């Protein structure tokens, strides 16, 4: 049965954008800032509602809400609030643009977003990217990456994955055999074969291929990728496989490793929590609890502090005991 996806943030009932705009203005006016009011209000409104508040704020006060928030807040808390204020349809495109901009490429961001978004989502991202930045996402990716990693990204950006339909067992067998021949049975690796199969077959078909692969080879496909590839390509192929198996489980793992060990990858923490808060953050929480023996809520609690922590916990939407 298909998993029902649930976010942790939804439209606020009885929403009044003018009242909210006034509350925010009061929280930032004069000496000192009432961070508590700002974070409580913004985390309990949907992204569409936050956009309406920004319009009302400008209408009532002739001021830009985002500029005011930026000048009143600092550090990670500011970054989180700024992310919440970005229109959701722009957010992924914005993150990709910044991953490609300037010296060095942030492959981690490219991999995470491009591997875990559906073909429909990717098409929407590409359209917004072009409207906002006046260049094609695919061209920018090609200009900033190379080799098989680049080719896999380009295949995914075509967003031409087969739609889910009745599974053809003969084709499943053929693909599983082809992957086995291209990796474990070959001196060297036929990366092209992995790229084509992973990038174009339907999700339900690939799940069967992974099971069949295990039967034929005695290995999980992840183990083979680990042995046969390396670097950015390995990370991308693994992200694709994990997303095919379960997007919420893949993103739960992404969050776990953003916080595990010394230091926290706050950029990833903010990006995943904000971008999934209205899509599947509830499912991500459940997978997190199941796979890591602790809850997302308690890990955020132990890993962050101050208003930043309070806001993240409100977005997380509850504890999973």
From Swiss-Prot:
Q: Which keywords appear in this protein's UniProt record, sorted alphabetically?
A: Acetylation, Annexin, Blood coagulation, Calcium, Calcium/phospholipid-binding, Hemostasis, Isopeptide bond, Repeat, S-nitrosylation, Ubl conjugation
Subunit description: Monomer. Binds ATRX and EIF5B.
Q: Specify whether Ubl conjugation is a keyword of the entry.
A: yes
Give the N6-acetyllysine positions (modified residues).
Answer: 70, 76, 79, 97, 101
What are the protein's GO molecular function terms?
A: calcium ion binding; calcium-dependent phospholipid binding; heparin binding; phosphatidylserine binding
Identify the domain of life. Eukaryota
Keyword Repeat on this protein?
yes
PANTHER family documented for this protein: ANNEXIN, ANNEXIN A5
- What family is it from? Belongs to the annexin family.
Task: Give the protein's recorded name.
Answer: Annexin A5
- Spans of repeat Annexin: 15-86, 87-158, 170-242, 246-317
N6-succinyllysine: which positions carry it? 290
Q: Motif ([IL]-x-C-x-x-[DE] motif) spans which residues?
A: 314-320
Q: Show the cross-link location (Glycyl lysine isopeptide (Lys-Gly) (interchain with G-Cter in SUMO2)).
A: 29
Which GO terms of type biological process are on file? blood coagulation; negative regulation of coagulation; negative regulation of sequestering of calcium ion
Q: Which organism is it from?
A: Bos taurus
Its post-translational modification remark reads: S-nitrosylation is induced by interferon-gamma and oxidatively-modified low-densitity lipoprotein (LDL(ox)) possibly implicating the iNOS-S100A8/9 transnitrosylase complex.
């Amino acid at each position: 049965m298909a998993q029902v996806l649930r976010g942790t943030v939804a439209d606020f009932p009885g929403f009044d954008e003018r009242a909210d705009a006034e509350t925010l203005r009061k929280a930032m006016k004069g000496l000192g800032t009432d961070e508590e009011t700002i974070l409580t209000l913004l985390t309990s409104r949907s992204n569409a509602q936050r956009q309406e508040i920004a319009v009302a704020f400008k209408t009532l006060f002739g001021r830009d809400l985002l500029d005011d928030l930026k000048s009143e807040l600092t550090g990670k808390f500011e970054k989180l609030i700024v992310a919440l204020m970005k229109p959701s349809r722009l957010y992924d495109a914005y993150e990709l643009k910044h991953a490609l901009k300037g010296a060095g490429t942030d492959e981690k961001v490219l991999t995470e977003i491009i591997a875990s978004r559906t073909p429909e989502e990717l098409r929407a991202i590409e359209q917004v990217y072009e409207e906002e930045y006046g260049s094609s996402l695919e061209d920018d990716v090609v200009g900033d990456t190379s080799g098989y990693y680049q080719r896999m990204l380009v295949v995914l950006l075509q967003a031409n994955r087969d739609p889910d339909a009745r599974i053809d067992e003969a084709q499943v067998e053929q693909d599983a055999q082809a992957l086995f021949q291209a990796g474990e049975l070959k001196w060297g690796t036929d990366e092209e074969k992995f790229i084509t199969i992973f990038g174009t077959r339907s999700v339900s078909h690939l799940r069967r291929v992974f099971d069949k692969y295990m039967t034929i080879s005695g290995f999980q496909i992840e183990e083979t990728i680990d042995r046969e590839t390396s670097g950015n390509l390995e990370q991308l192929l693994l992200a694709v496989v994990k997303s095919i198996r379960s997007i919420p489980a893949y993103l739960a793992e992404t969050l776990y490793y953003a916080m595990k060990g010394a230091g926290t990858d706050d950029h990833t923490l903010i990006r995943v929590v904000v971008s999934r808060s209205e899509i599947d953050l509830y499912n991500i929480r459940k997978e997190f609890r199941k796979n890591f023996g602790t809850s997302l809520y308690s890990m955020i609690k132990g890993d962050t502090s101050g208003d930043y922590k309070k806001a993240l916990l409100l977005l997380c939407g509850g504890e999973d005991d």
